[in-house]
Amino acid sequence: PINPNLTRVQAEGGILQGIGMTLTENITYDKNGYPAENSLFQYKIPARNDIGHIHVEFENSYEPNGPFGAKSIGEVVINTPLPAISDAIYNAIGTRFYELPITPEQIAMAVAAKQ
């Protein structure tokens, strides 16, 4: 059987990864092609205390082709924060961003450019 608590935690983790991909995670490379960020001091991934509480609920349904009637959740939860956050920023300041991460500095510069 599917463990709902484990599934909920997996969904929370995927959402957190999607938020990190959208807002903080940036990798750069040196002239030899090696990552310049070689530790978590340099490569910022969000932690639970950076984001706050994520409330996850599931709708019961049965998928006859999935194991035990289950559906995949990994792709859904990691891919949905990007469009949600980028559209929220667009609705707030009227600027679209086409590269990740969308940093606070980029948002501030976009707001300043409109003034």
Please identify what each model-predicted range represents.
Residues 1-115:
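C-terminal catalytic domains of large/alpha subunits in multi-subunit enzymes
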